Amino acid sequence: MCIRDSERTGTKGEVSHTQDLGFYRVKYPVQGKPLVSVIIPNKDEKETLQTCLEMLEKNTVYQNFEIIIVENNSTTDEIFRYYKELSGNRKIHLLRWGKEFNYSAINNFAAAHAKGEYLLFLNNDVKSINPDWLEEMLGVCQRPEVGGVGAKLIYPDNTIQHAGCVIGMGGIAGHMFVDMPADRTGYLHKASLLQDMSAVTAACLLMKKEVFEQAGGFTEELAV
């Protein structure tokens, strides 16, 4: 049924079974080779940042991206030595944010300097599990009805940190399935399925740059 619907709508997708009977996974192929601007705010965290950059280089199939590191008031000599090491990498650009910390403003600042058609907002402590992670997110984000794509995030103890957000949960918004074992699929298997969400976290968020600009970027009154 999923295959027929894909053919009927003219949407290309690779349909496969999941471990749950009656539920399917659709992987949308990337159209063309658009540039993705990966935006990573950073303060002092040399080893954390290095691990993230190595993940992008060695454990990411889709490689047409630039990396924008936003240096945010670091104080350690170690991180500035590392920035100097990175200066020879043509994919990496370093911006300096000299004002007080404001997560929204920092990312808006970087987005204004981005050359990519797509923006990937990425925390420096995120590591990929599957090499095709960016390719898969981009395939979904290219769909005309999609403005942004989030990711399932897992804590080091193999429990869920984020599998989408629900507006109104816990007052303003809350993460679904927090602290549930990552190998569990949850209510109606929603913890393991591609689906529409009220919101997603910007810890790993891919957006069309055009949509981000139309929305006015992040609200800078919300600093964190």
Regions picked out by a protein language model, each given a short descriptive name:
Residues R8-K58:
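N-proximal low-complexity "stem/linker" segments adjacent to membrane-targeting elements
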Residues A151, P156, G168-S198:
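Short, flexible, basic/aromatic active-site loop/helix in glycosyltransferases
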Residues L119:
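Short aromatic/hydrophobic "clamp" motif used to bind/position activated sugar donors
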Residues M1-S6:
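Conserved small/polar residues in nucleotide/adenosyl-binding loops
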Residues E57-K99:
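Acidic donor-binding segment of Leloir-type glycosyltransferases
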Residues V126-I172:
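Conserved donor NDP-sugar-binding/catalytic core segment of glycosyltransferases
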